[in-house]
Amino acid sequence: MKNAFKDALKAGRPQIGLWLGLANSYSAELVAGAGFDWLLIDGEHAPNNVQTVLTQLQAIAPYPSQPVVRPSWNDPVQIKQLLDVGAQTLLVPMVQNADEARDAVAATRYPPAGIRGVGSALARASRWNRIPDYLHEANDAMCVLVQIETREAMSNLASILDVDGIDGVFIGPADLSADMGFAGNPQHPAVQAAIENAIVQIRAAGKAPGILMANEALAKRYLELGALFVAVGVDTTLLARGAEALAARFGAEKKLSGASGVY
């Protein structure tokens, strides 16, 4: 079994991604052919469930873009279901310390290395037991990425990086900036300093640093610092801003206004 995304991170090849929040297999397939290295199927803030994640995995499968799935929480039951429908790479949100990082890894591994329940006869991941030796090879194909999104997590970064089985650490700029007292302003100098220091520390530990940043200059800056998986946009934002720009060119006025948001 192979995991092309995990292999790319191990080889130190930067991977450029797009965030998927439309929770729709049709739009997922549309962007799967756009040329991104990876696509994040968001189960934390988008209206996804196991079934919608499954259909998006199926839609993306024929294309070179690699799927990454974010569960809503570091929950072994939910993680088990996502792995069974075919997710190999998980982005686990709001990991605060090494114990929680170890829990995330354990949820992705079959015993004795972890606690993943065995149900391969029912699982798309094993192609319903048509993949020879799936139960013995699946553990090595798993890619576990954990999110650090608070000052507490930042203070525990060194111990998180020591956890065996963690392939990458993703910095969540939106929640981090809020936790630092700068909600909606991840570009604040204090937040940027924390992000940049974390990227350097993660890379120095031999793990892959990751982040979501739609600001092109900042995204390129993070890549220069050593970030290896960087999402540079969100499908909902692309659709909303693109639709607004098209309408504006023909004289339409925006009916709603509000905060510009982080992405």
UniProtKB/Swiss-Prot annotation:
Keyword Transmembrane helix: no
Pathway assignment: Aromatic compound metabolism; 4-hydroxyphenylacetate degradation; pyruvate and succinate semialdehyde from 4-hydroxyphenylacetate: step 7/7
Active-site residues per Swiss-Prot or TrEMBL entry: 45
Site (Increases basicity of active site His): 84
A molecular-function term among this protein's GO annotations: metal ion binding
Domain of life: Bacteria
Cofactor(s) listed in the protein's UniProt record: a divalent metal cation
Entry's EC annotation: 4.1.2.52
Residues reported to bind a divalent metal cation: 149, 175
Keyword terms: Aromatic hydrocarbons catabolism, Lyase, Metal-binding
Catalytic activity: 4-hydroxy-2-oxoheptanedioate = succinate semialdehyde + pyruvate
Record site feature (Transition state stabilizer), residues: 70
A biological-process GO annotation: phenylacetate catabolic process
Binding residues for substrate: 147, 174-175
Coiled coil: none
Any one GO cellular component localisation term in the record: cytoplasm
Cofactor note: Binds 1 divalent metal cation per subunit.
Role description: Catalyzes the reversible retro-aldol cleavage of 4-hydroxy-2-ketoheptane-1,7-dioate (HKHD) to pyruvate and succinic semialdehyde.
Complex and partners: Homohexamer; trimer of dimers.
Recorded family membership: Belongs to the HpcH/HpaI aldolase family.
NCBIfam families reported for this sequence: HpaI
Protein name, entry field: 4-hydroxy-2-oxo-heptane-1,7-dioate aldolase
Organism lineage: Bacteria, Pseudomonadati, Pseudomonadota, Gammaproteobacteria, Enterobacterales
